[in-house]
Amino acid sequence: MININGEIKVDNAAPFVLFGGINVLESRDLAMRSCEEYVRVTGKLGIPYVFKASFDKANRSSIHSYRGPGLEEGLRIFEDVKKTFGVPLITDVHEPYQAKIAAEVIDVLQLPAFLARQTDLVVALAQTGRVINIKKPQFLSPPQMLNIVEKFREAGNDKLILCDRGTCFGYDNLVVDMLGFGVMKKVTGNLPIIFDVTHALQQRDSLGTASGGRREQVADLARAGMGVGLAGLFLEAHPDPKVAKCDGPSALPLDKLEPFLAQLKQLDDLVKSFAPLDIEA
């Protein structure tokens, strides 16, 4: 079980936590408007909430694609969000020097999937003492996540969350292995597992210089994940996905947030009301 700021409990057996927001900080106004809606909906439904966004999308398909405001301006926007809404924050860090700076504002630091084996970055993140969200690389099997976890533990940080965002299935496609959630729980000693449902809907480079997506299937995939019994959901929404500057094809329309989360809350409550079934291998 992981605590965020002593307030939010992240545990596979506890009510799910929403790590939700926008893909990238397009503007201060978008961050504030989006967070306001997330706070309203999660407050109404009783869902613990952490706001997410990126200050830099350093791994865009094209050099011409929008990356974000950068570290300095991004942290100013994050500070405004935290001051206004009082919610914890999560963002991804791409270079070791950014970790300590981001940790001054950010509550949960994220290790990107494409960088999850970069030892210098792992050590820098671990040394901040912050809670760390480790994205499972699309190219790694669930048992291989233990190697990354052990790097963090050796570097002195066991405040870890694991996040699955799908696995490569041939070229330009991702699938989610629902059995993999349980495998990661088992090999890591039951670390909290969260599910990045919107990135799992990506279709890599299907638009040439940007990733496509299948947002019309987000509810199906999210319900399947919640049925396994997870610590949380990682979600991106946008007021108008068609004009989003990054990953719009995978984003949930923001006006669908309340009915979407209401279904998942009911399902999560039901699944976690069941007595565990211990079935020997």
From Swiss-Prot:
<dbReference type="InterPro" id="IPR006218">
    <property type="entry name" value="DAHP1/KDSA"/>
</dbReference>
<dbReference type="GO" id="GO:0005737">
    <property type="term" value="C:cytoplasm"/>
</dbReference>
<dbReference type="InterPro" id="IPR006269">
    <property type="entry name" value="KDO8P_synthase"/>
</dbReference>
<dbReference type="GO" id="GO:0008676">
    <property type="term" value="F:3-deoxy-8-phosphooctulonate synthase activity"/>
</dbReference>
<dbReference type="Pfam" id="PF00793">
    <property type="entry name" value="DAHP_synth_1"/>
</dbReference>
<protein>
    <recommendedName>
        <fullName>2-dehydro-3-deoxyphosphooctonate aldolase</fullName>
        <ecNumber>2.5.1.55</ecNumber>
    </recommendedName>
</protein>
<dbReference type="GO" id="GO:0019294">
    <property type="term" value="P:keto-3-deoxy-D-manno-octulosonic acid biosynthetic process"/>
</dbReference>
<keyword id="KW-0808">Transferase</keyword>
<comment type="pathway">
    <text>Bacterial outer membrane biogenesis; lipopolysaccharide biosynthesis.</text>
</comment>
<keyword id="KW-0448">Lipopolysaccharide biosynthesis</keyword>
<comment type="pathway">
    <text>Carbohydrate biosynthesis; 3-deoxy-D-manno-octulosonate biosynthesis; 3-deoxy-D-manno-octulosonate from D-ribulose 5-phosphate: step 2/3.</text>
</comment>
<dbReference type="InterPro" id="IPR013785">
    <property type="entry name" value="Aldolase_TIM"/>
</dbReference>
<keyword id="KW-0963">Cytoplasm</keyword>
<comment type="similarity">
    <text>Belongs to the KdsA family.</text>
</comment>
